[in-house]
Amino acid sequence: MAEIRVGKNETLDSALRRFKRSCQKAGVLAEARKHEYYEKPSVKRKKKSEAARKRKSFR
């Protein structure tokens, strides 16, 4: 989990923006969405294969 320390003269808005940015960099929301529901191993492999195929076609 992302953690920030609020400075003495820092507003709550700027602290919240920093927290959201650190969560985004850490990938907290993406990880939560990925584990939102169970995904069978065969489906995981299929998605991984499709992603690799898509990356390869861009080259």
Curated annotation (Swiss-Prot):
Molecular function (Gene Ontology), one example: structural constituent of ribosome
Pfam family for this entry, one: Ribosomal_S21
GO BP term (any one): translation
InterPro entries given in the database record: Ribosomal_bS21 (IPR001911), Ribosomal_bS21_CS (IPR018278), Ribosomal_bS21_sf (IPR038380)
Compositional bias segments (type: Basic residues): 43-59
Stretch list, region Disordered: 40-59
Alphabetical keyword list: Ribonucleoprotein, Ribosomal protein
CC annotations in GO: ribonucleoprotein complex; ribosome
Similarity comment text for this entry: Belongs to the bacterial ribosomal protein bS21 family.
Protein name: Small ribosomal subunit protein bS21
Record organism: Desulforamulus reducens (strain ATCC BAA-1160 / DSM 100696 / MI-1) (Desulfotomaculum reducens)
